[in-house]
């Protein structure tokens, strides 16, 4: 049989294939770089444009920071980067001044652990990883302004991270003005007497240390003895988001324990109301707004005081109407009053279920605290089994004088509310489960449920509640709060789930704190002239780790090893003195909490961002976005996994800078878009170990893999994430080698809506490649390389098709619907290929090439040049649809006969009812159905249908 496979010599010399695509892509990437094609001029500073006039129509597009991983990119990573590039290129072609840049979020635990494992310094591994990722991204032809790139690990960058920290440290929140103010203004208030000193003291007679302690208690950054997540196996404190629901570290899966440590905190709670309320000003997905609202957890209720042997216990409740049903009180095991409340002995007749098997309440408390030390807050809240111990004492219910037992239990958290609850088992399911387990009374105070089966959490009238009986829930809330306030037993109040931000890590690879301590241990902020505080070079930068189960171990930060760096002599304005540097570092969230501002002015050595540049790129645009526009980046794209923490912290920092007058925008991101994920199949052998997905073959509905011995093994298929550990990662380099970067870009954008997840299929990439080949052939003769474009006028049919495509693609690009834009371009290409076999009219193919440019910029630039244009198409013009060609010439009418569609007709768009009726009756199918009979009714619904009643 004859071998019909094509040889290399059979391929036309000028065919668009991977080799030609690679040459085109390298050439145009070099030209863009040399010409500064994507440079966005600033109003002022080193990046200002060559002319005094700056386009008023600007666009700031930003991707969420990539983290430079040692593994490089897989095909899922560039999805959002390509989408923002398409959006930026489209708007740039429409004449807007577009800022689009990309930096690297390079501090943090992953880089440090990778360095510890490899023995290389994290700075070296980070720089190497950035270089790898930059090379991969460059290959995709992303139109970034490279002058604006940076890494959070650059001293020139973290100098300003430290500077912003100091601005927050040197600020306090004025509740009357509802904004942050410089701490110097607070000091002036105390000095002048405008604000009374605490406890009626005379400010002038207070010692410097006493005054400093008062001022420090107001700062937006402060130090406190707080409950933290201590991970001995990693040797560091972890934030809540770094702890799994099982109470283990997300990285390394080590046990995590709750313990008290002296830590830096940021007073984000001062901004809780503004962080909630200002969500209404943002163009963000509703699910992200809901997640932030839930995280902040604003709730209205009452602060109620229960008398106890150790003083008053304050509880916060959103249901003060149920106070008459409170039959016991529960404190968080870490509550400050627990040790004082624990009785010396168990009272007579104490239920054995209440003691935890301990000889005394104090022993029970100690045992219980130890048993829950490794539980995360999430695990404690979700724990199905209710546990706790009695403290051996009772509190007094303030509304009826009833004695109620006091317990500690892990389902009450010290970090929420007051760390104490009044338990109403009749109307709270967790309380009901606890009361059932411990044999505690369950009282109905809201009618309408069966409290013997479960707590009644619905509406109803108040019962068994004295003066509240017969009232609705809302009426009862107002009434009981009024009575509590009158009797001095409580107040109506608002509470939040949001806790202050734990802002210290016991690691090496992070931003050092610009704080030193004097010989008395008092903290001092460094002056701006001493920034940046650079990380010292350490050969041994690994944190001191401990036995993973050693809950009693204490942190020993790596920076403490740099003794020459820690112990310094500085002149802070009162002569040279000895100081000790802070040996903690900032969390990995710090650098990403303000990077949008640095993109606007990345080379400024005198400020984090000049006011003119911030105003231009991020300032409010009320004419465009309405009177309440908070400003911010015009489009921010990234994964929904950062919905709460990163975005909440960035909003907090932006608001502080806004209050202090450093920025004009009160929000960092005006519009947020969460892209979906690219997923892929992974395969596991019978042991559950992953095998290389690329080596798996499908046969008769089953999947097989051949191991190193040549044995074929049946494997199981699963669908989900792409990753190195799953052995299903595909590098974009592989796809670019095989098809070219433009094909890769077009395929990723055509896979489906940007905000949904989609499966990767390498075999489907060829479809995108064949489309680009068809576009190429419209312009270039594959055999000779000559132009196939004619100067002939397109037909009316083509013009109508073309301008409808322009209108549709224009709308799609603006709405981030790149998949449907691509589909329309494919349809237009197919039409031109079929309609003009001997050569395509220039008037039709040039708009096609321009519309293709955002999706496949390299081949579009090449074709544009071959069409005779010397200037890059990167700045347009983007085609504009002619309204005359958007009008429908004909309209299709379905014809119903006795309620069923029997035929369809095409009539001129301007046809009147009489003409439509005549056309309907003349239709062959309708004429046959009527068989000469006259219809009893014939109704024309203009533009929609013809209805015949026979």
UniProtKB/Swiss-Prot annotation:
Class of this enzyme: ligase
Cell compartments where the protein resides: Cytoplasm
InterPro entries registered for this protein in UniProt: aa-tRNA-synth_I_CS, Leu-tRNA-ligase, Leu_tRNA-synth_edit, M/V/L/I-tRNA-synth_anticd-bd, Methionyl/Leucyl_tRNA_Synth, Rossmann-like_a/b/a_fold, tRNAsynth_Ia_anticodon-bd, Val/Leu/Ile-tRNA-synth_edit
This protein's GO CC annotations: cytosol
Motif ('HIGH' region): 66-77
The keyword rRNA-binding appears for this protein: no
Residue interval(s) of motif 'KMSKS' region: 721-725
CDD domains on file: Anticodon_Ia_Leu_BEm
Any Pfam family matching the protein: Anticodon_1
One GO biological process term: leucyl-tRNA aminoacylation
Protein name: Leucine--tRNA ligase
Organism: Nocardia farcinica (strain IFM 10152)
The organism's taxonomic lineage, starting at the top: Bacteria, Bacillati, Actinomycetota, Actinomycetes, Mycobacteriales
Gene, per the UniProt record: leuS
């Amino acid at each position: 049989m004859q071998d019909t496979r094509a040889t290399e010599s059979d391929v036309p010399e000028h065919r668009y294939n991977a080799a030609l695509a690679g040459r085109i892509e390298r050439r145009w990437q070099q030209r863009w770089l040399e010409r500064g094609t994507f440079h966005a001029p600033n109003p002022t500073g080193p990046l200002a444009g060559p002319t005094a006039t700056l386009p008023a129509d600007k666009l700031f597009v930003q991707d969420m920071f990539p983290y430079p991983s040692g593994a490089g990119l897989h095909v899922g990573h560039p999805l959002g980067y390509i989408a923002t590039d398409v959006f930026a290129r489209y708007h740039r072609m429409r004449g807007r001044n577009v800022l689009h840049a990309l930096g690297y979020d390079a501090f943090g635990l992953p880089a440090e652990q990778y360095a510890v494992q490899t023995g290389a310094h994290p700075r070296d591994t980070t720089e190497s990883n950035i270089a790898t990722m930059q090379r991969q991204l460059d290959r995709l032809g992303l139109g970034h302004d490279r002058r604006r790139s940076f890494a959070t690990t650059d001293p020139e960058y973290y100098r300003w991270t430290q500077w912003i920290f100091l601005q927050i440290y040197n600020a306090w929140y004025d509740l009357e003005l509802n904004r942050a103010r410089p701490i110097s203004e607070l000091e002036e208030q105390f000095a002048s007497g405008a604000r009374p000193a605490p406890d009626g003291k005379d400010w002038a007679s207070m010692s410097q240390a006493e005054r400093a302690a008062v001022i420090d208690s107001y700062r937006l950054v402060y130090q406190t003895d707080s409950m933290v997540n201590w991970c001995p196996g990693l040797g560091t404190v972890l934030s809540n988001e770094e702890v799994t629901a099982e109470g283990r570290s997300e990285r390394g899966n080590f046990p995590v324990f709750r313990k008290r440590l002296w830590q830096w905190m940021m007073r984000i709670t001062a901004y809780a109301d503004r962080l909630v309320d200002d969500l209404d000003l943002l163009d963000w997905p509703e699910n992200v707004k809901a997640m932030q609202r839930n995280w902040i957890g604003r709730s209205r209720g009452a602060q109620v005081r229960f008398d106890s042997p150790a003083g008053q216990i304050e509880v916060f409740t959103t249901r003060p109407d149920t106070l008459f049903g409170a039959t016991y009180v529960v404190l968080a095991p870490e509550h400050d009053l627990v040790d004082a409340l624990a009785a010396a002995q168990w009272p007579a007749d104490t239920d054995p279920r209440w003691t935890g098997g301990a000889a005394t309440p104090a022993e029970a408390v100690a045992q219980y605290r130890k048993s829950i030390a490794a539980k995360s807050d999430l695990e404690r809240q979700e724990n199905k089994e209710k546990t706790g111990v009695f403290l051996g004492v009772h509190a007094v219910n303030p509304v009826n004088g009833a004695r109620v037992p006091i317990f500690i239990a892990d389902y009450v958290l010290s970090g929420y509310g007051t760390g104490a609850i009044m338990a109403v088992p009749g109307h709270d399911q967790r309380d009901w489960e606890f009361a059932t387990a411990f044999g505690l009374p369950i009282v109905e105070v809201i009618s309408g449920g069966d409290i013997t089966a479960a707590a009644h959490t619905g509406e109803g009238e108040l019962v068994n509640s004295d003066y509240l009986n017969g009232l609705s829930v809302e009426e009862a809330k107002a009434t009981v709060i009024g009575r509590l306030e009158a009797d001095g037993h409580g107040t109506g109040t608002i509470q939040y789930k949001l806790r202050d931000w734990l802002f210290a890590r016991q690691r090496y690879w992070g931003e050092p704190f610009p704080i030193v301590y004097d010989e008395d241990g008092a903290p001092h902020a460094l002056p701006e002239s001493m920034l940046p505080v650079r990380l010292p070079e350490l050969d041994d930068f690994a944190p001191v780790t401990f036995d993973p189960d050693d809950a009693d171990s204490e942190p020993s930060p790596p920076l403490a090893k740099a003794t020459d760096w820690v112990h310094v002599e500085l002149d802070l304005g009162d002569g040279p003195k000895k100081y000790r540097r802070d040996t903690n570092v900032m969390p990995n969230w710090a650098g990403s909490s303000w990077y949008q501002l640095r993109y606007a002015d990345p080379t400024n050595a005198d400020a984090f961002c000049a006011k003119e540049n911030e105003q231009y790129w991020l300032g409010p645009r009320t004419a465009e976005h309405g009177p309440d526009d908070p400003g911010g980046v015009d489009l921010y794209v990234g994964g929904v996994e950062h919905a709460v923490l990163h975005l909440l912290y960035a909003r907090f920092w932006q608001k502080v800078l806004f209050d202090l007058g450093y920025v004009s925008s009160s929000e960092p991101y005006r519009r947020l878009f969460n892209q979906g994920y690219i997923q892929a199949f992974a395969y596991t052998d019978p042991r559950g170990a992953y095998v290389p997905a690329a080596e798996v073959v499908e046969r008769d509905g089953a999947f097989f893999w051949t191991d190193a011995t040549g044995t074929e093994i049946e494997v199981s298929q699963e669908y989900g994430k792409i990753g190195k550990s799953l052995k299903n990662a595909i590098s974009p380099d592989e796809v670019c080698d095989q098809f070219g970067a433009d094909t890769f870009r077009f395929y990723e954008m055509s896979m489906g809506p940007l905000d949904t997840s989609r499966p990767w299929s390498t075999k489907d990439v060829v479809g995108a490649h064949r489309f680009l080949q068809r576009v190429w052939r419209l312009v270039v003769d594959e055999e000779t390389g000559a132009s196939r474009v004619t100067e002939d006028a397109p037909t009316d049919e083509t013009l109508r098709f073309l301008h409808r495509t322009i209108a549709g693609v224009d709308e799609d690009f603006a709405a981030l619907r790149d998949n449907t834009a691509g589909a329309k371009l494919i349809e237009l290409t197919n039409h031109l290929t079929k309609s003009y076999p001997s050569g395509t009219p220039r008037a039709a193919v040039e708009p096609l090439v321009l519309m293709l440019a955002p999706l496949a910029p390299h081949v579009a630039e090449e074709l544009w040049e071959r069409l005779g244009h010397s200037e890059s198409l990167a700045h347009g013009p983007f085609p504009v649809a002619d309204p005359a060609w958007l009008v429908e010439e004909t309209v299709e009418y379905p014809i119903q006969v006795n309620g069923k569609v029997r035929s369809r007709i095409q009539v001129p768009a301007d046809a009147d009812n009489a003409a439509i009726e005549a056309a309907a009756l003349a239709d062959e199918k309708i004429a046959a159905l009527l068989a000469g009979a006259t219809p009893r009714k014939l109704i024309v619904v203009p533009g929609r249908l013809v209805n015949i009643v026979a």
